[in-house]
Swiss-Prot record:
Native species: Arabidopsis thaliana
InterPro entries for this protein: CDK, CDK7, Kinase-like_dom_sf, Prot_kinase_dom, Protein_kinase_ATP_BS, Ser/Thr_kinase_AS
Gene name in the database record: CDKD-1
Keywords associated with the record: ATP-binding, Kinase, Nucleotide-binding, Nucleus, Phosphoprotein, Serine/threonine-protein kinase, Transferase
PROSITE patterns, A to Z: PROTEIN_KINASE_ATP (PS00107), PROTEIN_KINASE_DOM (PS50011), PROTEIN_KINASE_ST (PS00108)
Catalytic activity of the protein: L-seryl-[protein] + ATP = O-phospho-L-seryl-[protein] + ADP + H(+); L-threonyl-[protein] + ATP = O-phospho-L-threonyl-[protein] + ADP + H(+); [DNA-directed RNA polymerase] + ATP = phospho-[DNA-directed RNA polymerase] + ADP + H(+)
GO cellular component: nucleus; transcription factor TFIIK complex
Tissue-by-tissue expression: Expressed at low levels in suspension cell culture, but not in plant organs.
Entry protein name: Cyclin-dependent kinase D-1
Main subcellular localisation: nucleus
Gene Ontology terms, MF aspect: ATP binding; cyclin-dependent protein serine/threonine kinase activity; protein serine kinase activity; RNA polymerase II CTD heptapeptide repeat kinase activity
Length: 398
């Protein structure tokens, strides 16, 4: 058996918990106080490659975000050729809970999990932070049953007038329709939509809207809620990648979730409002009658949790099953085939859809095959002076 290794004269590494694109997550013991922690080790690479901006952004944000429903950042330091980020240790995640068929989730259990998700988001939005990567395996669960938001690598500060963002955020199944139509300016409504998807997933015990491409994702959304009309979402036609879809009438939400309470359906319908300006806010959602009607939210200590994450996942995703902290994205971003057009990039798949629409064909019925290209490398910050980085991190954690 491999002996535990000490890192930075303080942390005693135990077993590997997970492995992703940018590094490894270890379970470790803090020799300073004996507590169990999770250490995310990120490869810095060669001098010319620099430090991954995502990791530094996550450190910066989590230093400012202190809340019972947000993962706690304990420490961060460079060691040898790696950047180490130390977090509180969490036992499992919400995806493992949802997938474990041996667990029964009562209406009170679902209400408790959703309430903790929304409380974490309410704090983030109060600090003008968008999470932008809400999904069940980024919602970690600790020994006391408390759910905490994690993986803030895609998070951004919002609220500045005119500020533009990329629309390629969130795993596709949790991506709001305005993002799928290429919106560059958005706010906390995108997190609300994702939280609604997670809410529905808790109720159904499976992902709610499972598109296999961005186009198919829109088709799944329209099949569930009907094709939006101009009076429902006036700004829709102004979005960069907007294409007119074949009209589909909205089915009854009750037909999709037949056993759910009326209060839960009402909250879901407000979280899935097409127009982001009219979509319910996190603060409004927490005040919805769903949370005050019976049954009451279950005490976190009494919430069901899987005995083993690995047992709760399919055998073909074992590494994903044991991730504890900031796991790698399970759904690789699918980028349409792009060709240069002027000074920017033009989405050829959108051109195909527009042409089909002009020809009188229904884009929703077309069979589009979008090839998955490797996304461009994330921008990096030069790390030539690593001693400067170490001094900076040391000062910040004094």
């Amino acid at each position: 058996m491999e002996q535990p290794k000490k890192v930075a004269d303080r942390y005693l590494k135990r077993e590997v918990l997970g492995q992703g694109t940018y590094g490894v997550v270890f379970k470790a013991t803090d020799t300073k106080n004996g507590e169990t922690v999770a250490i995310k080790k990120i490869r810095l690479g060669k001098e010319k490659e620099g430090v991954n901006v995502t990791a530094l952004r996550e450190i910066k944000l989590l230093k400012e975000l202190k809340h019972p429903h947000i993962i706690e950042l304990i420490d961060a330091f460079p060691h040898k050729e790696n950047l180490h980020i130390v977090f509180e240790f969490m036992e499992t995640d919400l995806e493992a809970v949802i997938r474990d068929r041996n667990l029964y989730l009562s209406p009170g259990d679902v209400k408790s999990y959703l309430q903790m998700i929304l409380k974490g988001l309410e704090y983030c939005h109060g600090k003008w932070v968008l999470h932008r990567d809400m999904k069940p395996n980024n919602l970690l669960i600790g020994p006391n049953g408390q759910l905490k938001l994690a993986d803030f690598g895609l998070a951004r500060i919002f609220g500045s007038p005119g500020r533009k963002f990329t629309h390629q955020v969130f795993a596709r199944w949790y991506r709001a329709p305005e993002l799928l139509f290429g919106a560059k300016q958005y706010d906390g409504a995108v997190d609300v939509w994702a939280a609604g998807c997670i809410f529905a997933e808790l109720l159904l015990r499976r992902p709610f809207l499972q598109g296999n491409s961005d186009i198919d994702q829109l088709s799944k959304i329209f099949a569930a809620f009907g094709t939006p009309k101009a009076d429902q979402w006036p700004d829709m036609i102004c979005l960069p990648d907007y294409v007119e879809y074949q009209f589909v009438p909205a089915p009854s939400l009750r037909s999709l979730l037949p056993t759910v309470s009326e209060d839960a359906l009402d909250l879901l319908s407000k979280m899935f409002t097409y127009d982001p300006k009219s979509r319910i806010s996190i603060q409004q959602a927490l005040k919805h009658r769903y949370f005050t009607s019976a049954p009451s939210p279950t005490d976190p200590l009494k919430l069901p949790r899987p005995v083993s994450k690995q047992d709760a996942k399919s055998s073909d995703s074992k590494l994903e099953a044991i991730k504890v902290l900031s796991p790698a994205h399970k759904f690789r971003r699918v980028m349409p085939d792009r060709g240069k057009s002027g000074n920017g990039f033009k989405d050829q798949s959108v051109d195909v859809m527009r042409q089909a629409s002009h020809d009188g064909q229904a884009p929703m019925s077309l069979d589009f095959t979008i090839l998955a290209e490797r996304p461009p490398n994330r921008p990096t910050i030069t790390s030539a002076d690593r001693s400067h980085l170490k001094r900076k991190l040391d000062l910040e954690f004094l």
